[in-house]
């Protein structure tokens, strides 16, 4: 086997009809882990239903449908391999909760693949003021997805077909837009493709012989290797807590930063409960240590299930332990709110695995969302499209960290009226020391 490939996550973004599913489906179909039998079954069904256009989106639609019906589709189906990487596709957008998932999502994307519809009218709709292309790109940048690949899709349907002039026009316009968002377009490959016909997806296309850059597959291989934050202090937000007969209390979650290992004394923020880790498991195998990205269960001593909740954060008691936030200041971008947001607004914040109402105590400044420059001090309100620095106060104890120190615990979605109305990143936190926190006997013994 040789050295195992590096795992990376990509998020596929773009306007609703840009061909995201077809393109993603194509990659997964050609390079991925979809079982041949499953493909054959789909192809047979497609033929019976006269779905001549079977191609690739259909694979994805089937997978989505099965996933939404609660048939657990092996998540491996959303993976594919390049020469260098194992790629996982994070919840392809179009999904209503996409924005929320992208923020609180199980993993930070290492690269965004922006799909553009190159056809006449299609491109214009996607990039227009209210098109999703802009919003998705802004979101990706704000949330720290610094690498991007741009695919000019549907080149088989431009006028004339595979038109270089059309490609050049799109590259020019999208570049100027991405520059405004904060990306450096010179570092972004613009790959002309057809997700449907397969041009330049994996093999170089003779239809596009005027193009000399990388294919989509080559561009994915050229992504800079992500640095994993295993050298930072431990942060492990809890997703669930189980009581397992004969073992005891087992919190479950994903290591975001640092490492967790048996024998470590952990402190759970925001309560300060401190205890010893007896064992760490992943996929029913005991681990000597778990690293960032690992989804693990770990057994803790002398702790009742009721003392731990989803949204609590496990940390190393001897290395910057997690604490609750008395208040914090965040840069917030309002994306989807019908009215005005003023002081006293109290929506729900989704940050890592916690879901807690937070009060906008004070809107400190309105800022230019691209440059970060201050536009106005203490504005009366913020509305759609505005960005501001806001002082927030959680209504219940919760752990947040600055985006600079612990990115996955420093980005959040603001939810109201069952939708994401804003996104934000935490700039600084006023932490409070827990009072009367329980330290178990096991932890006390360890501490001696």
Curated annotation (Swiss-Prot):
All copies of domain tr-type G, residue ranges: 5-230
Keyword Protein biosynthesis: yes
Single GO biological process annotation from the record: translational elongation
Matching Gene3D superfamilies: P-loop containing nucleotide triphosphate hydrolases, Translation factors
GO terms under cellular component: cytoplasm
Binding residues for GTP: 14-21, 91-95, 153-156
Segments for region (G1): 14-21
Positions where N6-methyllysine occurs in the chain: 261
Annotated InterPro entries: EFTu-like_2, G_TR_CS, GTP-eEF1A_C, P-loop_NTPase, T_Tr_GTP-bd_dom, TRAFAC_GTPase_members, Transl_B-barrel_sf, Transl_elong_EF1A/Init_IF2_C
Stored PROSITE patterns: G_TR_1, G_TR_2
Entries under Pfam families matching the protein: GTP-eEF1A_C (PF22594), GTP_EFTU (PF00009), GTP_EFTU_D2 (PF03144)
Region (G2): 70-74
Renumbered residue ranges of the record's region G5: 194-196
Region ranges (G3): 91-94
Record PTM 5-glutamyl glycerylphosphorylethanolamine, positions in chain: 289, 362
Positions carrying N6,N6-dimethyllysine: 55
Location of region: G4: 153-156
Residue(s) carrying N6,N6,N6-trimethyllysine: 79, 187, 306, 396
Subcellular location: Cytoplasm
One annotated GO molecular function: GTPase activity
Role noted for this protein: This protein promotes the GTP-dependent binding of aminoacyl-tRNA to the A-site of ribosomes during protein biosynthesis.
Family, per entry: Belongs to the TRAFAC class translation factor GTPase superfamily. Classic translation factor GTPase family. EF-Tu/EF-1A subfamily.
Protein name: Elongation factor 1-alpha
Organism placement in taxonomy: Eukaryota, Viridiplantae, Streptophyta, Embryophyta, Tracheophyta
């Amino acid at each position: 086997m040789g050295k195992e490939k590096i795992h990376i996550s990509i998020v596929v973004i773009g306007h609703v009809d840009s061909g995201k599913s077809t393109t993603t489906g194509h990659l997964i179909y050609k390079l991925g882990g979809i079982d041949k039998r499953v493909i054959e079954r789909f192809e047979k069904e497609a033929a019976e239903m006269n779905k001549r256009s079977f191609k690739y989106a259909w694979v994805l639609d089937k997978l989505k449908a099965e996933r939404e019906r609660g048939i657990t589709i092996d998540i491996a189906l959303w993976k594919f391999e390049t020469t260098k990487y194992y790629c996982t596709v994070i919840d392809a957008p179009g999904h209503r909760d996409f924005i929320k998932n992208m923020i609180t999502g199980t993993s930070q994307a290492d690269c965004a693949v922006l799909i553009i519809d190159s056809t006449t009218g299609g491109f214009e709709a996607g990039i227009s003021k209210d098109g999703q292309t802009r919003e998705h790109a802004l979101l990706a940048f704000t949330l720290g997805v610094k690498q991007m690949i741009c695919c000019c899709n549907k080149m088989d349907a431009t006028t004339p077909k595979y038109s270089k002039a059309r490609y050049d026009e799109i590259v020019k316009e999208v570049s100027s837009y991405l520059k405004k968002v904060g990306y450096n377009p010179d570092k972004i490959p613009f790959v002309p493709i057809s997700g449907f016909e397969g041009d330049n997806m994996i093999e170089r296309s003779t239809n596009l012989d005027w193009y000399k850059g990388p294919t989509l597959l080559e561009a994915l291989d050229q992504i800079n290797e992500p640095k994993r934050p295993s050298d930072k202090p431990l942060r492990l937000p809890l997703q669930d807590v189980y009581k397992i007969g004969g073992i005891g209390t087992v919190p479950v979650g994903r290591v975001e930063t640092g490492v967790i290992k048996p024998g470590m004394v952990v402190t759970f923020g925001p309560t300060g409960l401190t205890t010893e880790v007896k064992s760490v498991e992943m996929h029913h195998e005991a681990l000597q240590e778990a690293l960032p990205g690992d989804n693990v269960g770990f057994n803790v001593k002398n702790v009742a299930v009721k003392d731990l909740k989803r949204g609590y954060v496990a940390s190393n008691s001897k290395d910057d332990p997690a604490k609750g936030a008395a208040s914090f200041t965040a840069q917030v971008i309002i994306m989807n709110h019908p009215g005005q947001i003023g002081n006293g607004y109290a929506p729900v914040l989704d940050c890592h695995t916690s879901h807690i109402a937070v009060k906008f105590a004070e809107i400190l400044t309105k800022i230019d969302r691209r440059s970060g420059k201050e536009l106005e001090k203490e504005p009366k309100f913020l509305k759609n499209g505005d960005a501001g620095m806001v002082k927030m106060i959680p209504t219940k104890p919760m752990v947040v960290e600055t985006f600079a120190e612990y990115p996955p615990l420093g980005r959040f979605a603001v939810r109201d009226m069952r939708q994401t109305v804003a996104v934000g990143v935490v700039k600084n936190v006023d932490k409070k020391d827990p009072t009367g926190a329980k330290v178990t006997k096991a932890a006390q013994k360890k501490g001696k």
